[in-house]
């Protein structure tokens, strides 16, 4: 990703907003169970969206006893994939870890 786009992305705090909004998207996904789930990020960033793929598969973390789930998807800017994200959650809904990669 070029420096200007990367700076724009970070200057709006989008990584933190992704983290904050994911539980809401999780609830919507649980109710709809689509193959893919799109979410436009917000009125101030209409060209940024999330595309969720293959949600809720087990994450093999041998040192944790609870069921684990991994959310994975693409970060899209002007209809172009600019990166990906993954978040790990325990079966009871407790946040575990995340990865955000801007390419």
Language model: regions and residue ranges:
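A general, composition-driven signal for non-globular sequence regions
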Residues: 38, 48, 91-93
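Exposed beta-strand-loop-beta-strand "reactive/processing" segments of non-cytosolic proteins
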Residues: 43-87
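A broad structural signal for short, well-ordered beta-strand segments within beta-sheet-rich domains
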Residues: 32, 50-52, 95
């Amino acid at each position: 990703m070029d420096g200007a786009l990367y700076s724009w992305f970070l200057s709006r705090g989008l990584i933190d907003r992704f983290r904050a909004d994911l539980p809401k998207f999780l609830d919507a996904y649980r109710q709809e169970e689509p193959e893919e789930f799109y979410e436009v990020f917000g009125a101030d960033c209409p060209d940024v969206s999330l595309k969720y793929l293959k949600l809720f598969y087990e994450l093999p973390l041998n040192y944790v006893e609870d069921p684990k789930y991994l959310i994975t998807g693409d970060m899209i800017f002007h209809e172009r994939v600019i990166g990906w994200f993954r978040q790990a959650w325990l079966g009871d809904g407790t946040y575990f870890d995340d990865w955000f990669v801007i390419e």
